Amino acid sequence: MLKDIHQHRILILDFGSQYAQLIARRVREIGVYCELMPCDIDEETIRDFNPHGIILSGGPETVTLSHTLRAPAFIFEIGCPVLGICYGMQTMAYQLGGKVNRTAKAEFGHAQLRVLNPAFLFDGIEDQVSPQGEPLLDVWMSHGDIVSELPPGFEATACTDNSPLAAMADFKRRFFGLQFHPEVTHTPQGHRILAHFVIHICQCIPNWTTKHIIEDSIRDIQEKVGKEQVIVGLSGGVDSAVTATLVHKAIGDQLVCVLVDTGLLRLNEVDEVLNVFQKHLGAKVICVDAKDRFMKALKGISDPEEKRKIAGEQFIRVFEEQAKKLNVKWLGQGTIYPDVIESAKTKTGKGHIIKTHHNVGGLPLNMELKLIEPLRELFKDEVRKLGLELGLPADLIYRHPFPGPGLAIRILGEVSAEYINILKQADAIFIEELKKSDYYHQVSQAFAVFMPLKSVGVKGDARHYGYIIALRAVKTVDFMTAQWADLPHEFLSKVSHRIVNEIKEVSRVVYDMTNKPPATIEWE
């Protein structure tokens, strides 16, 4: 019997926290479906979602100012358990009659939490025990405000040296507040605390498992598509691979895979993709040579958003042409949940569009194909788990992500055949050396970027003006935040040496040492 994987659900209201998506991932890891929505979402949407529990995220603002964000008041009146984290705890306390003040000593980083009442959230959880027998927890703090007076009905359930009210609870109404961040890895017991809220307090059944997600996706595809054919674009990345595999598992020969050779793929990627999918998927694969078409469309275009939208437009037009030849009505896309989040606009401005994702905002409004997106609810790590469960090779599953517009957005400014050729070679050298040195799987994504600027250098006995190549490598779990990879200097020196010696047009190589945020992972 198929499980309803969406039956039990948690709603996360986002107050602009850098950790909001991480909260969602943690809830998914517990085995329960959740969605992330802006904190000012309307009442009808929340009631339609019908959550079993609500989590209020942290945020960068202060509750002490009258114009800052508040939780929708009605969520405290519908009988639903609520967990406030950091800012979420503070706004809950303030809105329910407590007091919040600026603290004389802000807490940023590690703190030791002393549990005063372990009921519900902290039951059976401890890192250490105090001499008085009280449970102690290592937690991660990041706040400049504190709850200075509890709302009616609440009691203090934990404290730190600097925060007498580091956790609070109204057990009767099932409202809980945590001043620390249970979602980050720096709070070792955070996963168990969240599980207590989601499973024990909200009474959610953990049906959100890889096996159940696959079963649900297959059923959904079959119900939507019926006997019609689906066309799926292959890129060599894990998202399109898992999408194609899921669709193939659901409808078999009704799937037609199309690989568009845009001229913007990585070195030798077309041959590699064809080999992998024809060998492992067993589906029909059509390769379309669209290099001239893409170059013509991108000629004279420097704006990154325009390049993304043009790439999306051209992809869809190629697919539509193939679909007409084959009488296909459906387009399968590898859109994943972070694509949806980053491309969403919210009334608060807390979810401003950072960049248009090729799989979301790049689609033309007059698209003739119906869209099916089986991965739309999933984070990248969930997609990888699905791929392994579906039997795709690990080398493909753990291949670094590659953007839909390809090298067009790794070339700053206008794209040209010369720039593409230079970038392909530089990128191939970087990836080859990462694999040879066993660093490839230690980083989450790595690539080269072409800068159409010339820098003076010396080759032989002559001055040489050549282009600049930037190398980018990051480590991340969910691609919502990322840290630049601290690769050994000897390794970077070797890569740089190869690039400037093997690619005559390049005179300088630089390494990008910027985290996300403030930067995005891609340069454009």
Swiss-Prot record:
Pfam families: GATase (PF00117), GMP_synt_C (PF00958), NAD_synthase (PF02540). GO terms for molecular function: ATP binding; GMP synthase activity. Residues 208-399 form the GMPS ATP-PPase domain. CDD domains: GATase1_GMP_Synthase, GMP_synthase_C. It is an enzyme of class 6 (ligase). GO terms for cellular component: cytosol. Pathway: Purine metabolism; GMP biosynthesis; GMP from XMP (L-Gln route): step 1/1. Keywords: ATP-binding, Glutamine amidotransferase, GMP biosynthesis, Ligase, Nucleotide-binding, Purine biosynthesis. Signal peptide: none annotated. Homodimer. NCBIfam families: guaA_Cterm (TIGR00884), guaA_Nterm (TIGR00888), PRK00074.1 (NF000848). This is GMP synthase [glutamine-hydrolyzing]. It comes from Coxiella burnetii (strain RSA 493 / Nine Mile phase I).
